[in-house]
Amino acid sequence: MTTSRCSHLPEVLPDCTSSAPSGKTVEDCSSLVNGQPQYVMQVSAKDGQLLSTVVRTLTTQSSFNDHPMCRICHEGSTQEDLLSPCECTGTLGTIHRSCLEHWLSSSNTSYCELCHFRFSVERKPRPLVEWLRNPGPQHEKRTLFGDMVCFLFITPLATISGWLCLRGAVDHLHFSSRLEAVGLIALTVALFTIYLFWTLVSFRYHCRLYNEWRRTNQRVILVIPKSANLPSAQQSLLGLHSFKRNSKETIV
């Protein structure tokens, strides 16, 4: 995960002269609204996918010390309890479980890219139906849809054509027309050979795309150790105290 520099230390003015990380842009981090400076916080996955963006005035930064928030969605603990699953401290030390699982799934990693703490996770493959609904980029969607339409159209056509050719070959054999019968049989074999070759090539191509999608789009479940399974109220209270204590260490 990559974050803009002005989102790490809310007590420090953002450095607007620094360039944004690759795959992400920071827009107008020195703008003024009602005479108050603003700063932009953005969180991106490793592949450049933007996970969250928030714009706040500088006067609201002091509230971060008293009200911890998720470092990805920048929301508090009203909807979901905040956790501290890694060794990050200060404003980057708390995160929602659902946000962390979504980020680990999007970035296809199992560790924190800030403190390099490796999380204990379970990865489960997503169902085939989900891939059929959204196989990936637009050109892959068009290819999958086109091949499915061709398969549904060519399969009965090839079957009927092969049956008619074989029926004609049998009729020619009854009338001692062996040359025509051999020609129809050869046509039937060529027809089914081309059909099977196209089917196998298309099937292998889409199987490769599905296996790659299944490997990079797994559902991640964060496993919290049993020793860390505290009641939600006690865990939130401990997380709040530790956040207040560690947030002072981030001031430089």
From Swiss-Prot:
Q: Which residues bind Zn(2+) 1?
A: C70, C73, H96, C99
Q: What class of enzyme is it?
A: transferase
PROSITE patterns according to UniProt: ZF_RING_CH
**GO biological process terms on file:** endocytosis; protein ubiquitination
Where is the protein situated, by its record's location annotation? Cytoplasmic vesicle membrane; Early endosome membrane
Q: Which domain of life is it from?
A: Eukaryota
- Lipid bilayer topology: Multi-pass membrane protein
Q: What is this protein called?
A: E3 ubiquitin-protein ligase MARCHF3
Q: Which organism is it from?
A: Xenopus laevis
Q: Which gene name does the record give?
A: marchf3
